[in-house]
Amino acid sequence: MSSNKNTLILEPQDYSNRSISIYKSMGTVFEYNKDFNNHKEIHIIICRLGLFLDMEFLSKFPSLEIIGSSTTSLTHIDEKVIQDRHIRVLSLRDCFEKISNITSTSELTIGLTIDLVRRMSAYSNSVLKDGTWNRDQFKTRQISSMNIGVLGLGRVGSFVAEVFGKFGANVSFFDCNDSIESHLAKSVSKNALLETSDILILCPSWKHGNPIIMGNREFNIIKEGVLLVNTSRAEVIDHDRLVESIKLGKVSGYATDVLPIKYENDNAGSHELVKLYEDGFNIIITPHIGGRTTDAMSYTEDCIADLVLSHYNL
């Protein structure tokens, strides 16, 4: 079934065997490394999140036709370059129905929220690192007595709202698509959500060109002492205002799975949020692991392979 369409897998470690078989049926499959030099032979690039596909990188691939990314976000791809070169990008945005049963990011969001409220990581560190056994070190609350606001009621937001609703929490949501209805949570205005939420969970979809969702205006009206959780994108929030609000106590805790891209990989330690954590503020940061489970990754890699196959009508 070969169509002589050669594929380069940028991050081949533990990649789905089924997906690799599909790409091999179309042509030669290459695995990327620092010594790779077959750029001119590549028609398809398959990526995760480890590399930023900018103009300099993509210019090395004159025959490139498709980029396949097993992600919902495309912030790791220079969208202007691919538009100018008419390169087709296939991502999980193209198979939302297929990924509706994937819960890995929702699970992480729930875990980060509970950790932020109950201070589990901080308590664990006090025992394991400091050797102290002090159950009175932090004042925490029961989630069932709190108001939870979900900003963005898509796949992740809906799952999160359902779980916390079953805890007995008062769950409200705002979505920019005002036609969304849900039995899982009460629909309110964005202002009402910001003003009343004890815990505000950011789950919006976001792409290049969209406005910031948590900016100066939003930080001015959020509830005093709110706990903020972000497993969406770093770009949805004004980090300068976030840091300022944490220092002032307006935001009493922040848990996130994302940082601005310039701080990812080896630069994370220089971000102001890390410094706030070191100063004792309630900060939790994970290195973009929302979808980083073996079963979810294998499934989504196969989804992209099927999309590529369909694109070439094979």
Segments and roles (model prediction):
Residues 1-44, 48, 168, 172:
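N-terminal glycine-/charge-rich "phosphate-binding" loop or analogous flexible N-terminal tail
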Residues 4, 64, 144-147, 225:
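Phosphate-coordination loops involved in phosphoryl transfer and adenosine-cofactor binding
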Residues 53-55, 177-270:
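Rossmann-like adenosine-cofactor binding region
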Residues 61-66, 84-88, 169, 224-226, ...:
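A short helix->loop->beta-strand "cap" motif at the edges of active sites that frequently abuts
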Residues 95, 225, 232-314:
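Rossmann-like dinucleotide-binding domain for NAD(H)/NADP(H)
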Residues 123-159:
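Glycine-rich NAD(P)-binding loop of Rossmann-like domains
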